[in-house]
């Protein structure tokens, strides 16, 4: 018996499915500098739809239609949640206060959410309320254009954990998906919907890393590609956009432009130090700055005086830190951070590292916040992330 005799006849679909005839070239009117790249992305999007549909149908069949997935609330509902959260803030119009300045930026972002889809910059100085302002813009923009997802792309997992917690407090636990290498939803029945959503990003707000985002778009594995069709019709916010890796910048920018041109996506480059990306984007592409009166904001929020300590010995750094009542010391390596902590170890001295489990880091941060609330107590933190006494540190993993 030949193999053809053992294959079932599936031609019955011809009576069940009517496939419309394509009368014109769907790409004929598309103008792009790199048509081959654009066609490649289109094929990947189709593949993503196919793979996700196949997984979902198989899952439904195997579980007899008892699927544990929940997609979360509509964007309009999430916007209402945010508006309730920030309602009292909007009454503050005192531009001589920090909160008044934050309100000015927040209001501008809410108004800008009514703009057409496209490229946006949010250049906000440290302390200007960038996280909430960007969320306000994204929700307003998503409701205005009936967009389905808001995707935060962030280089550091430590920042992701903090931002995701803020979003959950405002929007609710079930509406925010945190997706990176440090997240393990395990076998918990309570977290099962999140574990399933991490496979295809079927949640209204997704917080992930640069690596996870771009690897999914360029990957050759079905498990990675499965989620990318849900990037279409989304607001994608690149927090700390200056951290996009230089060696991969051109393909990353090309992907952003393709998402904006063909997949109803808006891009927000969000940072306290806007990188010079304008020359890399298409010269005809214009962007809208979301932050009002940028120069004034940076002058107002300038609360740090930088001092170059030069090259100093390890023991000198220890002695300097011992004289500080409150300090954050960031070093290059986990080993160096551990050595400093051991030398300084005592009441009010803390250590943070990406070697710790996320729950452990959160516990330490909670202890630090509690101690900082008492101004009479000293607090010194040795860390491998970045703020003061800093040396260049590597980016976190995906």
Pin down the residues of each PLM region:
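Conserved strand-helix element at the start of the C-terminal RecA-like helicase core
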Residues: 159, 324-343
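Post-DEXD/H (motif II) to motif III coupling segment of the RecA-like Helicase ATP-binding lobe
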Residues: 244-294
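Conserved motor-coupling elements within RecA-like helicase/translocase cores
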Residues: 190-203, 358-380
């Amino acid at each position: 018996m030949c193999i053809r005799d053992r294959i079932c006849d599936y031609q019955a679909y011809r009576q069940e499915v009517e496939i419309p005839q394509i009368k014109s070239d769907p790409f004929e009117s598309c103008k792009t500098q790199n048509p081959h790249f654009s066609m490649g992305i289109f094929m990947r999007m189709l593949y993503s739809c196919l793979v996700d549909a196949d997984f979902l149908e198989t899952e439904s069949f195997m579980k007899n239609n008892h699927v544990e997935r929940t997609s979360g609330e509509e964007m309009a509902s999430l916007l209402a949640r945010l508006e309730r959260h920030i309602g009292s803030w909007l009454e503050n119009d005192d531009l001589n206060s920090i909160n008044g300045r934050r309100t000015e930026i927040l209001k501008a972002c809410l108004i800008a959410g009514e703009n057409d889809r496209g490229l946006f910059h949010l250049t906000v100085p440290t302390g200007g309320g960038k996280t909430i302002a960007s969320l306000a813009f994204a929700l307003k923009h998503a409701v205005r254009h009936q967009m389905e997802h808001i995707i935060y792309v962030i280089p550091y997992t430590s920042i992701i954990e903090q931002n995701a917690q803020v979003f959950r407090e405002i929007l609710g636990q079930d509406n925010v998906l945190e997706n990176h290498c440090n997240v393990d939803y395990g076998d918990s029945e309570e977290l099962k919907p999140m574990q399933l959503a991490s496979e295809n990003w079927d949640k209204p707000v997704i917080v992930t890393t640069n690596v996870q985002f771009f690897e999914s778009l360029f990957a050759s594995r079905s498990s990675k590609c499965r989620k990318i069709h849900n990037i279409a019709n989304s607001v994608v916010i690149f927090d700390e956009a200056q951290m996009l890796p230089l060696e991969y910048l051109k393909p990353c920018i090309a992907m952003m432009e393709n998402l904006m041109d063909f997949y109803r996506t808006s891009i927000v480059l969000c940072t306290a130090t806007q990188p010079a990306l304008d020359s890399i984007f298409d010269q005809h592409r214009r962007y809208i700055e979301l932050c009002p009166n940028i120069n004034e904001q940076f002058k107002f929020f300038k609360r740090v005086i930088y001092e170059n300590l030069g090259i100093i010995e390890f023991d000198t750094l220890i002695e300097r830190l011992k004289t500080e009542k409150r300090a954050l010391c960031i070093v290059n390596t986990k080993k160096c951070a551990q050595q400093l902590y051991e030398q300084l170890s005592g009441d009010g001295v803390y250590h943070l590292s990406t070697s710790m489990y996320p729950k452990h880091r959160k516990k330490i941060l909670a202890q630090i916040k509690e101690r900082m609330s008492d101004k009479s107590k000293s607090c010194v933190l040795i860390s491998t992330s970045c703020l003061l006494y800093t040396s260049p540190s590597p980016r976190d993993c995906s």
